[in-house]
Amino acid sequence: YVFEDAVLYNKTEFIAYFLQRLNLTRDDIVILDRASDIGQAVLQHKGDSKVGVVIHADHYSNNMMSEQHILWNNYYEYQFSKAKYIDFFITATDIQNHMVCRQFEQYQGYRPRVYTIPVGSIDALSYPKLSRKPYAMISASRLANEKHIDWLVKAVIVAKRQVPELTFDIYGEGSEKTRLRKIIDTHRAQDYIRLLGHVKLDEIYNDYELFLSASTSEGFGLTLMEAVGSG
């Protein structure tokens, strides 16, 4: 990165330069999500501002903990290790809020300041204006490894042999899209399994009879909540 007053050789230096130019004061708040490659620069150059960290996913490995040790989610490990320099954390649910506080006290001897701010809500239940499409199924999520959409695709391919009317529409974008497309093409399932990308889903859930999910990691499960709210 080349500027009139600086030559920066990596992302960390760029973040540090950016923060310095902001001239942050005690009236400012810096919100961190995942802190990969930027966490240290933010804490070193935040000035008098406050720093908050959003925890939007499972924050630890349930099968890698004991009374003395816990394995944090790698995306939050740096922030948690520097918790005394973080002014507050934000969780999506009260359950996770209480869990974070309890685990910090147990494993780090420190009680952080944690606020609960839900990432979404349903204002009203939604009902289909017309009949739902028979045997139509939907999934909606990031197309990421932990969502395991590939499991759903393979399951639908098998189920199609017994229920020929099945269709499966996949909404979302992500790094797994190419691999999912390959599975669909390999099994010649293009006629009944579709990748439909990002779409506003408010009125679309009502078209389907079944919502599918194989996710093994959910911070809040917003699309699950939306699907339940649509029957």
Residue ranges and their predicted role:
Residues 29-31, 44-63:
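Active-site proximal beta-strand in glycosyltransferases
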